[in-house]
From Swiss-Prot:
The lineage of its organism: Viruses, Riboviria, Orthornavirae, Duplornaviricota, Resentoviricetes. A motif (YGL motif) lies at residues 447-449. Residues 483-510 form a coiled coil. It comes from Rotavirus A (strain RVA/Human/Australia/RV-5/1981/G2P1B[4]) (RV-A). Residues 247-478 are annotated as: Spike body and stalk (antigen domain). This is Outer capsid protein VP4.
Length: 775
């Protein structure tokens, strides 16, 4: 699992001087600025396979009880109950439309004998005779129908909760009357309901009319306890007010600014025009059969006027998650059939990439706070004639879906001449009328939009909307940043790495096996590994440092500890009462046991603390002398060394990534064995395990207790020639006991002799290992 090279990587045994550290820190800082710009996203890393992603939920939840609010004067909206909590006697509220409706509610405390009291109503002093002999508060609703009329008591509410209610609804004003908890509602007519305003003198709450049952409950039984806590502070009603500001069609807002960079918020109204692409493929033969009718991505370029500005836009429309249908009219050559035709339905998604030549898209490299809102559009299918050689031909007709905006992200459009940083709008679909059918066939009344004629003769479909984003751009608007015309530093490196990966994989066919075995006989270390690089490198030591720092963050460091801990912990935790017969299926006792301790191994992620544990629990043989064993990692290291020497593109910038990838990806399926006297116990990374005798190669029961002792006390050898290959070699050619021992130990001299003799079984095994050394 860890050869000499990878052991050096894990232990990080190299020392560096101050110059190397400064150079490393400087390169990391430069890369960090370019690659990881905080909250910004890079546009050129669009995913390859697009799913619908998150589904935005814009459901608005209206609270049952809103408040409390401070006393105020305002014109209340219709369809809302206003619950007013009176804390003292006197006027609770006054309400009028200055036309035919004047009403005021007066609170009188309990145990008041008949008396005259003065009140100020609508700016005038009024005297009323009041009386309250009960233990509850009384609220007198005083009403008059004209400005010159006198007030009279229209209704009275007796309550121990000191709550009164008022509602504007259906051309009437509704209030509560009677005695709680049996109070009911009643109403007063008015010809001018909308102009009624209210002056409230106490704290109040707001409840939508849809929750009128809750309002009745509060009037009869009082507010819930949480509303009476001293932590609830009444707010001004103005806190509910929304200042409406009509947005401009084009808005460029400076969010922040420094000497070199600034954040600009771009708000744009846009018109999106798009069309579906499709492909109809006909089978050969007599002309009665079609192979495929499918959706294809379609580009569309157009111009439109936006706030006096002429905008040139480009869209690309594609369909994801289509449904495959077919029609088979019979088995005869003259029977009409369609092998596959695509239909977009509710489970499908439409993606529209949009770009225009405005300033918003000029420097769209680092973007945050991206939002959009687009209207829906209905797409109706047309007719497509399946023109048969003879007779009336079938016609696919109809079908419709509606596109609903479901999200937006960054993307890159690739045209014939240029790649464009763009916005990708995602639309969910709902099926609509009409249904589609294939006339003169049994296919009728199906819903969705088939790919036969999705545009229905229209040049394009159109929708409108608006998007907003914040982009990091240069402060100097006159300076044309190269970002818009080139790729970033990381993308240049990715391109180099991709080219290097392709070259490495193609070199697998050119590696001579004898050269590989000879190379494996040498003790490869960091310095010999990097000696073949043809580009200029200042110091091999600094190169090794870069590789180790990259390797330390790789997946291999964690996977090594997980694998080794699973070997020893699983063996020690298994049942010690019986031996386990070898099991070649991936669902084995070994697999289940190793899974049981995976949580423990996963919880430890510190590489530096695990390397000491690895060396104690599992000691791997590296290739040091001709008689010592050679591990899988020695094969992969030898392949890596050979490819580095043969490569024309390797350099100091790409080497750390390539070495790290090679350690993770070379030879993913590996086997390991322990040897004790005449017995071999072998396991692989797929969970298979078995034991066998060296002299006969016959399987024996797998003793997990014995394995638990051997795996911690004996060397573990990587199985270059695995048990399957050994059995095949013995069955076809016959091998001696000494040859079997040497092959089990992965002796390089014996391997080279078999290869020089052109043994097809050994040669094929080594070739397969080389082919597995791919990136």
């Amino acid at each position: 699992m860890a050869s000499l090279i990878y052991r050096q990587l894990l232990t990080n045994s190299y020392s560096v001087d101050l110059h190397d550290e400064i150079e490393q820190i400087g390169s990391e800082k430069t890369q960090s600025v370019t690659v990881n710009p905080g909250p910004f996203a890079q546009t050129r890393y669009a995913p390859v396979n697009w799913g619908h992603g998150e589904i935005n939920d814009s459901t608005t939840v209206e609270p049952v009880l809103d408040g409390p609010y401070q006393p105020t004067t305002f014109k209340p909206p219709n369809d809302y109950w206003f619950l007013i909590s009176s804390n003292t006697d006197g006027v609770v509220y006054e309400s009028t439309n200055n036309n035919d409706f004047w009403t005021a509610v007066i609170a009188v405390e309990p145990h008041v004998s008949q008396t005259n009291r003065q009140y100020i109503l609508f700016g005038e002093n009024k005297q009323f005779n009041v009386e309250n002999n009960s233990d509850k508060w009384k609220f007198f609703e005083m009403f008059k129908g004209s400005s010159q009329g006198d007030f009279s008591n229209r209704r009275t509410l007796t309550s121990n909760n000191r709550l009164v209610g008022m509602l504007k609804y259906g051309g009437r004003v509704w209030t509560f009357h009677g005695e709680t908890p049996r109070a009911t509602t009643d109403s007063s007519n008015t010809a001018d309901l909308n102009n009624i305003s209210i002056m409230i003198h106490s704290e109040f709450y707001i409840i939508p009319r849809s929750q009128e049952s809750k309002c009745n409950e509060y009037i009869k039984n009082g507010l819930p306890p949480i509303q009476n806590t001293r932590n609830v502070v009444p707010l001004s009603l103005s806190s509910r007010s929304i200042q409406y500001r009509r947005a401009q069609v084009n808005e460029d807002i400076t969010i922040s600014k420094t000497s070199l960079w600034k954040e600009m918020q771009y708000n744009r109204d846009i018109i999106i025009r798009f069309k579906f692409g499709n492909s109809v493929i006909k089978l050969g033969g007599l002309g009665y059969k079609w192979s495929e009718i499918s959706y294809k991505a379609a580009n569309y370029q157009y111009s439109y006027s936006r706030d006096g500005e002429q905008v040139t836009a480009h869209t690309t429309c594609s369909v994801n998650g289509v449904n495959n249908f077919s029609y088979n009219g019979g088995s005869l050559p003259t029977d009409f059939s369609i092998s596959r035709y695509e239909v977009s339905k509710e489970n499908s998604y439409v993606y529209i990439d949009y770009w225009d030549d405005s300033k918003a898209f000029r420097n769209m490299v680092y973007v945050r706070s991206l939002a959009a809102n687009l209207n829906s559009v209905k797409c109706t299918g047309g007719s497509y004639d399946f023109r048969l050689p003879v007779g009336g031909w079938p016609i696919m007709n109809g079908g419709a879906v509606s596109l609903h905006f479901a999200g937006v992200t960054l993307s890159t459009q690739f045209t014939d001449f240029v790649s464009l940083n763009s916005l990708r709008f995602r639309f969910s679909l709902t099926v609509d009328e009409p249904s589609f059918s294939i006339i003169r066939t049994r296919t009728i009344n199906l819903y969705g939009l088939p790919a036969a004629n999705p545009n229905n003769g229209n040049e394009y479909y159109e929708m409108s909307g608006r998007f907003s984003l914040i982009s990091l751009v240069l402060t100097n608007d006159d300076y044309q940043t190269p970002i818009m015309n080139s790729v970033t530093v990381r993308q240049d490196l990715e391109r180099q790495l991709n080219d290097l990966r392709e070259e490495f994989n193609s070199l697998s066919q050119e590696i001579a096996m004898s050269q590989l075995i000879d190379l494996a006989l040498l003790p490869l270390d960091m310095f010999s590994m990097f000696s073949g690089i043809k580009s200029t490198i200042d110091l091999t030591k600094s190169m090794a440092t870069s590789v180790m720092k990259k390797f330390r963050k790789s997946k291999l460091a964690t996977s090594i500890s997980e694998m080794t801990n699973s070997l020893s912990d699983a063996a020690s935790s298994a049942s010690r009462s019986a031996s386990i017969r070898s099991n070649l299926s991936t669902i084995s006792n070994w697999t289940n046991t190793s899974k049981s301790v995976s949580n423990v191994t996963d919880s430890v992620n510190d590489v530096s603390t695990q390397t000491s544990t690895i060396s104690k629990k599992l000691r791997l043989r590296e290739m040091i002398t001709q008689t010592e064993g050679m591990s899988f990692d020695d094969i992969s290291a030898a392949v890596l060394k050979t490819k580095i020497d043969m490569s024309t593109q390797i350099g100091k910038n790409t080497l750390p990534d390539i070495v790290t990838e090679a350690s993770e990806k070379f030879i993913p399926k590996r086997s390991y064995r322990v040897l004790k006297d005449n017995e071999v116990m072998e396991i692989n990374t797929e969970g298979k395990f078995f034991a066998y005798k060296v002299d006969t190669l016959n399987e024996i029961p797998f003793d997990i207790n014995k394995f638990a002792e051997l795996v911690t006390d004996s060397p573990v050898i990587s199985a270059i020639i695995d048990f399957k290959t050994l059995k095949n070699l013995n069955d076809n050619y016959g091998i001696t006991r000494i040859e079997a021992f040497n092959l089990i130990k992965s002796n390089p001299n014996v391997l080279r002799n078999f290869i020089n003799q052109n043994n097809p079984i050994i040669r094929n095994r080594i070739e397969q290992l080389i082919l597995q050394c791919k990136l």
